[in-house]
Amino acid sequence: GGPFQCNLRTLVYGGGPMYLADLEVALETFGERLAQIYGQGESPMTITALSKARHAERGHPRYLERLASVGTPHCVVEVAVRGEDGRALAPGGIGEVCVRGDVVMSGYWNDPAATAAALRDGWLWTGDLGAFDEDGFLTLKDRSKDLIVSGGSNVYPREVEEVLLTHPAVAEASVVGRADREWGEVVVAFVVPRGTAPPVAELDRLCLDHIARFKRPREYRFVDRLPRNHYGKVVKTELRKELAGG
């Protein structure tokens, strides 16, 4: 037991969601060697960072909240969370993460329409939804295109996935919306079981104990694997296509 011993000093992670359940396992395995960087190709590796020192602050009263964040803004950029009207939101407000600085791209090659959509008034609109806390730590909620609107209420898939992954029989989970005549969209969870698939009633109970009832999946689909791209990210468009095809 305990972290393994080696000459490895730092292990940097990023490029996709790091679920809290997985991060806690990584800390148990590697010790306090972990650091996180959040960036995009349009603003490479320079939006926020969560340092090794922050990973080691186990005694802090908001340790788990900070661990679930992507850290604080890098010194070379300005970062803001903005609403649909373009105004910066106060701490706690969920909106789109926007970045400004010399490292931000000047535009997409030969694609003025995409450039105009992404760059507005000098700010890069990243397509990521998130919120700052009072101490300047940024927590990502989801990609804006993956947001589920059910009965007029927003459901952030990652919040549901985080809960499902706490079940010992769930190895992986990915949540998407399915079109619904009554609700607009309903929540569907694709689950890769660890061995035998867990009873749906257990997953329902787990969700009801941790999140609002309207966020609970209406359907669970147990699969052998989730579709991923060459970066290892889950391709949710493929999951939505599967639902659309029945």
Where are these regions (language model features)?
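Active-site glycine-centered loops adjacent to acidic/histidine catalytic or metal-binding residues
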Residues: 15, 39, 71, 128, ...
